[in-house]
Structures are given as C-alpha cells and as structure tokens.
Amino acid sequence: MDTMTFCVPCLFGLEGLVGDELRRLDLQNVRVEDRRVFFEGDFAAMAKANLCCRMGERVMILLAEFDAHSFEDLFQGVKAVPLERFIPKDGAFPVKGYSLNSQLHSVPDCEAIVKKAAVTRLGEKYGLGWLPETGETYQLRFSIMKDHVELFLDTSGVSLHKRGYRREANLAPLHETMAAAMVNLARYRGRDFFWDPFCGSGTICIEAALIALNRAPGLNRSFMAQKWSCVPETVWQQARTEALDREYRGEYHILGSDIDAASLEIAQQNARKAGVGKLIEFREADATKMSLPADKGLIVCNPPYGERMLEQRSAQRLYSAFGRHLKYADGWKKYIISSEPEFEHYYGKQAVKKRKLYNGRLQCNVYMY
C-alpha cells in the first residue's frame, strides 16, 4: 500500500502535545491543526499510532478532500474515491459526520448522500446491484467545514481514550487522554515522587505508571483495522513486539489518595486491569489534612468541581483548604486542572502558568505552580 495521510483528532488544547508525541514515535510529516494532527505513513505507522498514542482520540485514513456546495458535488466527490482499495464486497461501511458553517448543513442528509455515493461506487466496482454488508466494519467519517469536505476511514473503532482498564468510574471522571496530557505537562518520566491527592478511580496515577514504564496504552485493547483483510496481521504483531521491546523496568513512587473508600476500591481494580497494580500505592486520606508523603515531587490532580450552586460552594471551600494545606510545600510542583474560573482566588495563589484545555465539552485550565 502506498504512503497514506492519517488524521488524529484530539481534545482542544492537546494538539501540540499530540504532535510532539507522534514525532517521538518517528512518524513522518507531522502537521498540527486545531483539534487534530496529521501524519503520513503506511499500515505499520497506523498500527504504531493506534497502539502507542496516549493523547489522541482515534487514527483515521484521509481518503479524499474536495469542495461541495451542493448534494450533487458531495455525491460525485465521494463516488470518485477508490473505496475498493480498503472495503471488500461484503464489508459493512456505516457513515458518521458533521458539518459546520457550510451550505450543506443537514448532517443526516449529508450522511445519506455519502452512503449512497459509497454504495454506488462499490456496487459498480464489484458488479453488484446490492451490497450485503455482512463482513467486517469499515467506518466512514466525514467533516464539512466552510464547504470543504474531508472523507476519512476510521482505523481505531472505539475511541483511543478507552484503554480497556476502566470499566467503572466515580463522578466527574477525567478522560484517559486528558490524564495522560496532564502527566506529560508535568514532565513526569518516573524519576520524581508522583502524587494525586484526589485520585478518584485512579486514572491519573495509572497513566503516570504507564508513562513511567513507557508501556503502550493500547496493548490491552483491539482496533477496528485489526479485522480488515487489507491489513496484514504481521503489521499488528510487529507493532506489539516493538512496543513491548521499548518498555522500561524500575522502581517508581506513585501515590493516589482519596477521601472516598469506594473510589479507591475502583482505582485498585482499574490499576490491576492496567497491569500496574503493584506500582501504585492507594491510600484513604483527606487531601487538605494529609501529611506530605515526601519532601519534594509532583502533584497532578483533578479536584472535585460542582455543577450546581451548593456543589460549587463546597468545591470552592475545598480549593481554599487545599491551597492553605500546600502553602509551604515548596518542594512540590503542582499541576491542577479545574473548570472553576476563579480557581486561583480560592486556592490563594496565582499560577506560574496556565493552560486552557477541554475535558470533553467542559472548559478547564491546568494551573501550574
């Protein structure tokens, strides 16, 4: 297969981190745009990105791009794409997409047109008047932005933030991709004492352990393209072997504490599923009263936030108490994510640096001290 262009969508604010990550994986011609990062390569590069990308949401092949001001433009543009290079005669090819600031604004209508064009193209190429779609799934995705269409083939299936270790979560969970981003912002590589004092279901600590080990986050899950006839099985075997060869071994100090015992039980289960249960210590403790576990280290955390007024006031009091507790913890660097716009006021200190991110649709800032 010739060199292809791939697109990795990501949460807003993580584009630069994802770009750096893909470059570290030796992927070629990495290009960063708003909420997505592109690279070029073959199926081996695709498998490596799926297995090893910590902060992207999925890996998609860019099949085509063209302008469309009418449904006929959209139909002809999709019909011209050589879908038969990837989709066999029995392949199932559902369609999902979105449209913004375009003349073709009805997403259901656009999805129907893309589907019709794909059916027409494949029917003609395979000499079939009806396509059974009883085989493996080849998810088509499209975006229409300012009348410019991009057509993609999703190779990941389930979003990459689903690593396969978290089946249960407490309230206000942090996406695994966002947790990995916070650990990367803290520049944690396994040498410092790492502490999440509001660990909840353990996501930040687990992602820290995976990063310390240099363990590929996708080793415990499967991907849509693994079942495709056009992708040799050896591609996936080689990618997994290389990922395992890159792992580190060492002694790490990772602590997750929380005031809620039920959350800690879930955290321990999740850590075991992720294969890092022995690397993380979980402790029941109040973050505003607990003694510092070491003289220096990294604090990376997602304190509780409230959506209703009473919950917001409770969260604000918690930020104040937490700030007072850490007032003299000068040996600790702190990376705290919060959706509270006045977080610095309640915490009692201006951040050295701030970075705007989105946890799903929730606008947040990472406050760095």
Predicted regions and their residues:
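Non-catalytic nucleic-acid substrate-recognition regions in nucleic-acid-modifying enzymes
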Residues: 2-136
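SAM-dependent Rossmann-like transferase core, predominantly class I methyltransferases
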Residues: 151-187
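C-terminal catalytic and target-recognition region of SAM-dependent MTase-like enzymes
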Residues: 286-369
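Short beta-strand/turn micro-motifs composed of small residues
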Residues: 10, 258, 338
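A short, flexible beta-alpha/helix-coil linker loop
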Residues: 100-103, 159, 304-308
